[in-house]
Amino acid sequence: TFGRISGDNFALLRCYRDIDDLVARFLRCSDLLTRFEGLANRRFRVEMIAGIYLVERPEDILSIDDMLDRANLAQKSVKHLSGSKYALYSEEMRKRVLYEKNIESCMEEALRNREFCLHLQPQVDIQHGDALFGAEVLVRWERPGYGMVSPGDFIPLFERNGFIVDLDAFVFEEACAYLASRGSRGLPPLRLSVNVSRLSIAQGDFLDRYSAIRDKYGIDSGMLELECTETMVIRNFALFRELMAALPSRGFRSAMDDFGTGYSSLNMLKEIALDVLKLDIAFFRDTEGTPRERAVVESIVQMARALGMSTVAEGVEKQEQVEFLRSIGCSAIQGFIFSRPVPLALFESVEASFPLYVEG
């Protein structure tokens, strides 16, 4: 049985003996549609994706509406499966959707009740005595009655729903408040790197708003670094090029995270001004790699230095990695080898275990 449900949604109900055969048939149909050139001199791009609900046992037989709902849920999940055109429904999929809906339902309340807190992960200068000079600011969410919500779960949902703009601003202000508190207690300067999303940066008053927050707390110029990912920069190049050019005059530093995970890295660096290049661990995970692999990492570090950037290697866990990165002139390290991210209340005790950083 084949029928149109609505719009461009169709349903197929059929018996099968081999799921692999069913999938193969679907992929052949999808391939034919992809090659469809159009009608009346008009070209079209046609794609087909499918959500599949399998009835393998008597208890799998549900009402038509319930089976369609499950197939539709599987179809919606296809976009999260890179390169896939179909997905099979599973109970884990249903639980995941319910979990995400629960998170989405309490986002606004969580922001209003300030359920979020900051953790800091130290950044250590490996060229000057392994002194701690800064930290990356990471946000954590502890939901009353639930516990910790994984950042990997809630941050994409905040981005999807637009609440990431308010969350970014909250994190930035909390970071400023912490730096002001350190200053009032006579603690040494600390540079904080704060992540910002594309949606926040796209706000017309982004720099004015963040500058006003910083000035309210009297934070010195250069003590706050705005960090974005390489993927964000590649996908929104004009927006980020304009931002990076404006940051120095506003007293902010800039950093690009996950360098090397995209495809336009080297060409991009010619056109944007950055203070810090953060190297993805994929570049140096295997310090016993081939001479070619080691040469690539060293070349990136040298290139960054020639362009006036410092380099921070993320995800470092082994002493051999530290020594390799030190030997090629990498500026700093952020990783479990020195410290995991820690709550603000514990950061200063961790900081005390490192040598005092002296600028220059």
Regions found by a protein language model. Give the residues of each.
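Cyclic-dinucleotide signaling modules
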Residues: 1-101, 105
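Residue-level recognition of strand-loop junctions within catalytic nucleotide-signaling folds
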Residues: 12-17, 34, 55-56, 142, ...
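Surface-exposed amphipathic alpha-helices with a cationic face
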Residues: 30, 179-183, 214-215, 241-249, ...
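Short catalytic/binding micro-motifs of nucleotide second-messenger systems
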Residues: 31-43, 178-184, 214, 355-357
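C-di-GMP signaling machinery
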Residues: 56-59, 73-119, 158-162, 198-207, ...
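Catalytic core of bacterial c-di-GMP phosphodiesterases, primarily the EAL and HD-GYP domains
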Residues: 58, 128-136, 163-239, 315, ...
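Active-site core of bacterial EAL-family cyclic-dinucleotide phosphodiesterase domains
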Residues: 99-157, 195, 256, 313, ...
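EAL-family c-di-GMP phosphodiesterase catalytic domain
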Residues: 144-145, 197-204, 223-238, 250-360
